[in-house]
Amino acid sequence: FLYSQELMPRRWLLLGATTLVLILVLGEAHRAPANFTFVRMFQGKAIYLSAILPAIFYLTARYLSPRGTSADAFLLACAQITAIGLSNFSILAAPMAGAGALLSNYILLNQQSKRKFWYVVATLSIALPYLIAVMLSSQGGASLSQFETELPATVWKSVLGWRQHYFVAVLLLAGPILAADKLLRLRLAIPMLLLLAIYLNPLLSPLISRFVTTPPVYWRVMWSFPLLVAAAAGFCLVIEYVREKATRRIFPMMLGTVVLFLLAVSIPFHTLRQDNDIRWDFAAKKISPDDYEVAQTAISAMEGNTGRLLAPDEISGIVAMFETHPVLVNARSLYIGFLAPAMGEEDSAARQLLHGFVSGTAESGPAVRAALNSLSVATVVTHGSSQQPELELLLTDERFRRTHAVHGYDIWHRNLPSSR
């Protein structure tokens, strides 16, 4: 609401309320800002998107305005610092957002406000020491080039929704076009221009993905400005335009009809729909209850015993979340390649082989037997091993016995004299 007050001072309450409505409507995609803003509020990145991102735009606009004070500058610096602790990517996203906010308010700058300009620029470099430290510490680590870069068009649709992105696009375009105030027009247009012309530019996206964001999280360039507030501003301006011009021209009627049609198409895929896996709870677990029970059972099977626990990713990832848990062969198979330089070729190859073994992508054989023993595996979680006779035979030969069958998983255990 504070950012709404800065964008549209005379209609800030309507803009804030419209933003809340769009949060409830635009939740089709798992990556959607609406999902992060409301449904996943217990995550740090959700707090960044819902609070810190609009705060950066609000505080930048307020500080650069004639009524800006040193208190606004201090809070802007605090927002950049807070972003560092909320999410790994917000270390990049917050300076990107700050740059967009600074450029969208450039007409407020004059000879007397040069000091303000350089102060805002300074806040953009707050995360720089941390970024340099991360870069230096990752030297010699596994390359992320194995991941393919998502196409910008795919990023756009996967974040805004495969059906809802048309509605959002119309609102984001309508805002700058219909805004009568020059400052409002710039505040809506420039962050969007940066997103489309630079961050989602098909010519630049491979470079940005590889050297700035890394391919797995390239889609988070969409976190560079508050999309929902900008879309809400566009909606408010469309309604105002239609109300003023509809009786005299056909275009306002057509625009209003298109917006209402796209809204009607979007509503069935709202944020609170049942297939979005919504549960009303405080900091609810973002995991399958069945998988959680399997993880608990696997941990209890090893209680008081030595050795490592081997499980598929969906189970081992949950086991790793427990404050006290057995030593895992892998928390997530994705990390094997990342940590290979630190583990050594033989160790990482054994872990990769065992991951394939419990995931059903690698055949049983002498190499698997050797890996089970070299890594001192005491407990194994498998998908219904009764349908995999070779797997069952191998585990039995290696002195494992099936102790539990839970939700389609079998838990095998053997006693080891000591841990590796």
Predicted regions and their residues:
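Transmembrane-helix signature of polytopic, membrane-embedded enzymes
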Residues: S4-A34
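Transmembrane alpha-helical segments
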Residues: A29-H30, L86, S90-I91, M253-K286, ...
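Transmembrane catalytic cores of multi-pass membrane glycosyltransferases
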Residues: R31, G44, F89-L193, L200-L203
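Hydrophobic/aromatic-rich transmembrane helices and adjacent perimembrane loops
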Residues: V39, Q43-I52, R210-R243
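Membrane-interface transmembrane helices that cradle and orient dolichyl/undecaprenyl
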Residues: L53-F74
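Membrane-interface alpha helices of multi-pass inner-membrane proteins
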Residues: D72-F89, A99-G100, S125
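Signature aromatic-anchored transmembrane alpha helix within multi-pass, membrane-resident enzymes
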Residues: G100, V121-L128, V238-T271
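Short periplasmic/luminal acceptor-recognition loop of GT-C membrane glycosyltransferases, typified by
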Residues: Y292, Q296-Q352, R369-Q388, W412
